[in-house]
Amino acid sequence: MYVHHLFLRDFRNYRRLDLALAPATTLFYGPNAAGKTSLLEAIFYLATTRSPRLSSDRELVRWDAVGEAGTPPFARIAADVERRIGPVRLEVLVQRRADDDGQPLNGAQKLVRIDKRPARAIDLIGQLRVVLFTPTDLTLVDGPPAERRRYLDITLSQLDPHYVRTLAHYQKILLQRNSLLRAWREQRRVPRHVDAELAYWDQELAAAGGYLLAERLRAIVELNDLAGPLYQEMSGGEDRLQIEYAASCDLGTARDAGGLAERLLLAFAAQRSDELARGQTLCGPHRDDLIFTVAGINLGRYGSRGQQRSIALALKIGEAGLMRRRSGEAPVLLLDDVLSELDAQRRAHLLALIHHPDQQTLLTATDLSDFSADFLAAVRRYRVEDGQVFAG
């Protein structure tokens, strides 16, 4: 799998870009704020429908972009992707919102096309699989639980169309259930009506949550197999890394979706009074976490910076291995100025992944001196300056 062509219009600081890409390694270099990261962001967005940097799509549209025929400005991101199952054209238009008088509103709207046919944003996910490495990956280890849930969800959503749809369904049900719990707490609903409605939402949430849990637990088994030995090598012979799934409720020994759904129903019943008092759902996949241990020590809490960096890198390389193992194709690797952050040993492990046959890697750097002459001779290079890309 690789991106054959990337097209941008009014995206970030790019007015226009039409760039052919090789199926091997491409290095984009140049000063900060030149647009290097935006190239990787565009490809990540096509794969996941979200930016790794922003909460609002509105900011993706170039600040001085002009709309056509009185319409609000928009950004266009498109790519031709070569895959084992056949080529595909992916395209997203992100348009700023405006009122009837043309005055800007908050937010943006998306128009998605797959092979030039209109599609839903959710249908885009999994058409192109990517793994993004950034200097902020350390938050996977020492950041809040939401970062680790997001890591799992992005990985599994790209591999399993049913997972991403179930995740979206779960989030909608969760909003409904929380709204009902708050209504009871604020005495806006009759208690007997709340009980009947909660019974319905409990069943719906448990069914969706059971599937999410089953897939997450299966992925953790595989990630332990892939990332555990990598950490051991990078750390110079420390004990093997163990990734533990820290569920917010007692799952018992259940591992299949049906059994896990039953465990969730039991947990909802046990926590009913607390949930009604607090007005929120207190257990489920939306509150779970990952714990990283070596020799029984929680390295997310007590590990050194070097240990935590090794865990983050092992997780990302493990993510790429999981995608290759399940799909039979290597994902596109996006490395945003990360090699300069790594010591020689960690860099060697990442370069070994880059040099794997059939692996497309797109990486950015500010300084070519971070790379050996042999590496620079083996890759395609582009200089990025002020939203323009030049060969060499």
From Swiss-Prot:
One of its GO terms (biological process) is double-strand break repair. One of its GO terms (cellular component) is cytoplasm. Pfam families: SMC_N. ATP binds at residues 30-37. It is found in: Cytoplasm. Keywords: ATP-binding, Cytoplasm, DNA damage, DNA repair, DNA replication, DNA-binding, Nucleotide-binding, SOS response. GO terms for molecular function: ATP binding; ATP hydrolysis activity; single-stranded DNA binding. Gene3D superfamilies: P-loop containing nucleotide triphosphate hydrolases, RecF/RecN/SMC, N-terminal domain. HAMAP family: RecF. The RecF protein is involved in DNA metabolism; it is required for DNA replication and normal SOS inducibility. RecF binds preferentially to single-stranded, linear DNA. It also seems to bind ATP. This is DNA replication and repair protein RecF. The gene is recF.
